């Protein structure tokens, strides 16, 4: 077991704190101004465990958030987790105990997701999003399968539309496979033709699990707070697993998350949309191939160089700039970099200029060679 390619680059950064590193690697949107939150309680919050399912304050805030999206569930259908990855692990361990043996993921998929599922002994298959979603390949799945699908998709930004989502949910009810919907970018759907809240179409939550978090949707990865939406009986079982695996999520973090949930995230969505326009214009001006994403907090750019790992190495060496490449995904390729669009505009512009300069030099070197 080893760190991901991005994790290795960030470890190199941590080992050289004297260097003026700049990080363009994380697709977490950054608040233009820190959100105005009330001071969170006293020492008492840290001197007691929260309920394993989550605090009443946060569960109610999440219920209201989902109601605004058209997702009609009660607090009994919600479980607070230590982020979306924690939720995925809870669900996957629960499902393997129920006999699930194969995981099918819409690809490319984060390397960490594939590794997590594979480490549980699952047979992990990763068809491309167009093959799986466009071809509606879920019709071949059954009770021994888990289908993991995120919309907006990381990294391509593709999203489910209403007709496809209805077909997916009908197939899940008919065929009995487990469906895990990763919704960690659901506040950032840009295409009017895309479905902003697929769970609003779920008629029966049995076998369906929604994942979400405050990391991307609220720009707060340090809180390590996420949530699962599921059938109430499954929430009871997952809450029991939460209790004996980690007891509960931090009470203080849940209080901050509840405030963020009530505050909303409009400054983040506006910044991400502006960043999308900037990156798309830059890519076209520099001859880089890119499909406008339907959603998400980044743009998946085909950099036009023979090897994006070499590009990333050069950016670190020459500009002290860290980027994420397609090696961070499975199956890996050598063509793409992931450009976050929710960062400070001047930093984004400066970083794109560095990427342009190094990419052009590498392209010229490849042509001469």
Swiss-Prot record:
Q: Extract the Gene3D superfamilies matched here.
A: Type I PLP-dependent aspartate aminotransferase-like (Major domain)
Keyword Transferase (UniProt): yes
N6-(pyridoxal phosphate)lysine modified-residue sites: 216
Q: Source gene?
A: argM
Can you state which reaction this protein catalyses?
A: L-arginine + 2-oxoglutarate = 5-guanidino-2-oxopentanoate + L-glutamate; (3R)-5-guanidino-3-methyl-2-oxopentanoate + L-aspartate = (3R)-3-methyl-L-arginine + oxaloacetate
Keywords, sorted A to Z? Aminotransferase, Pyridoxal phosphate, Transferase
The pathway is:
Antibiotic biosynthesis
* Classification via InterPro entries: 3metArgNH2trans (IPR030898), Aminotransferase_I/II_large (IPR004839), AspAT/PAT-like (IPR050596), NHTrfase_class1_PyrdxlP-BS (IPR004838), PyrdxlP-dep_Trfase (IPR015424), PyrdxlP-dep_Trfase_major (IPR015421)
Query: Its GO biological process terms?
Result: amino acid metabolic process; biosynthetic process
Task: State if Transferase is listed as a keyword.
Answer: yes
Pfam families, sorted: Aminotran_1_2
Task: State the superkingdom.
Answer: Bacteria
Family, per entry: Belongs to the class-I pyridoxal-phosphate-dependent aminotransferase family.
**Enzyme Commission designation:** 2.6.1.125, 2.6.1.126
Q: What is this protein called?
A: 3-methylarginine biosynthesis aminotransferase ArgM
Which GO molecular-function terms appear in the entry?
pyridoxal phosphate binding; transaminase activity
Explain the purpose of this protein. Answer: Aminotransferase involved in the formation of the rare amino acid 3-methylarginine (MeArg), which is incorporated into the peptidyl nucleoside antibiotic arginomycin. Catalyzes two rounds of transamination: the transfer of the amino group from L-arginine to 2-oxoglutarate to give glutamate and 5-guanidino-2-oxopentanoic acid, which will be methylated by ArgN. Then, ArgM specifically catalyzes transamination from the donor L-aspartate to the 5-guanidino-3-methyl-2-oxopentanoic acid produced by ArgN, generating the final product, 3-methylarginine.
Known cofactor(s) = pyridoxal 5'-phosphate
Which cysteines share a disulfide bond? none
């Amino acid at each position: 077991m080893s760190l991901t390619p991005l994790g290795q680059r960030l470890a190199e950064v941590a080992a050289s704190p004297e260097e003026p590193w700049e990080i363009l690697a994380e697709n977490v949107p950054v608040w233009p101004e820190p959100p105005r939150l009330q001071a969170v309680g006293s020492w008492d919050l840290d001197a007691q465990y929260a309920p394993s399912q989550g605090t009443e304050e946060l569960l109610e805030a999440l219920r209201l958030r989902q109601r605004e999206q058209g997702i009609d569930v009660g607090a009994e259908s919600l479980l607070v987790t230590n982020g979306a990855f924690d939720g995925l692990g809870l669900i996957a361990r629960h499902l393997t105990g129920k006999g699930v043996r194969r995981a099918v993921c819409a690809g490319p998929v984060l390397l960490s997701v594939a590794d997590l599922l594979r480490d549980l002994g699952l047979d992990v298959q990763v068809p491309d999003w167009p093959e799986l979603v466009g071809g509606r390949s879920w019709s071949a799945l059954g009770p021994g399968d888990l289908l993991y699908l995120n919309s907006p998709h990381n990294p391509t930004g593709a999203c489910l539309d209403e007709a496809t989502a209805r077909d997916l949910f009908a197939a899940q009810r008919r065929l009995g496979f487990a469906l895990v919907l990763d919704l960690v970018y659901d506040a950032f759907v840009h295409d009017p033709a895309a479905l902003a809240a697929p769970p609003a179409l779920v008629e029966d939550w049995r076998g369906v699990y929604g994942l979400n978090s405050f990391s991307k949707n609220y720009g707060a990865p340090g809180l390590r707070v996420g949530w699962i939406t599921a059938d109430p009986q499954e929430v009871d079982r997952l809450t029991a697993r939460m209790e004996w695996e980690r007891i509960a999520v931090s009470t203080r973090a849940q209080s901050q998350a509840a405030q963020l949930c009530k505050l909303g995230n409009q400054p983040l969505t506006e910044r991400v949309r502006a960043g999308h326009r900037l990156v798309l214009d830059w890519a076209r001006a520099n001859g880089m191939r890119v499909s406008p994403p339907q959603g998400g907090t980044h743009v998946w750019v085909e950099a036009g160089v023979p090897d994006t790992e070499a590009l990333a190495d050069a950016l670190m060496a020459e500009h002290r700039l860290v980027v994420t490449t397609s090696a961070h995904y499975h199956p890996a390729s050598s063509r793409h970099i992931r450009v976050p669009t929710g960062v400070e505009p001047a930093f984004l512009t400066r970083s794109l200029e560095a990427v342009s300069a190094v990419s052009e030099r590498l392209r010229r070197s490849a042509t001469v060679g």
